[in-house]
Amino acid sequence: MIESPPLLDFKIIDETDDYAVVDKPPFLLIHPTKPDGRRTLWQELRGLFAFEIAAGGQVSIVNRLDRETSGLVLVAKKADVARRFGQLMQRRQLKKEYLAIVWGWPEWKSTLVDAALDRQGKHQHSAIWLKQMIHPSGAPA
């Protein structure tokens, strides 16, 4: 079976032989969640990097973003690079920043959230599927 060419619903911001930095738009899934035929960033990157994959490379998403979230995604193109980025993530040596849209007018210009985060829909009604909230049972930010 011949795979269809990638749709390129995203932009490559930076690329080397080892990794790519992708600007993911909102509502583009990172990985397949169910077999409904919906295109994902991972599938599109596999099509885009088919030559590298044929030569022994891979597509490893280092940091994921929720479906509603837009932003930069780091993609390793080799197993050893994916392992190294994974170690850096575990040790929190890769910095992640989020710009949040808030309701109202906060009294602060910027703030740091260092609290447990969980899916709001697990604890109260949320119109957004993966809307995050501070909750004691959540994972560290």
Predicted regions and their residues:
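RNA pseudouridine synthases
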Residues: 1-141
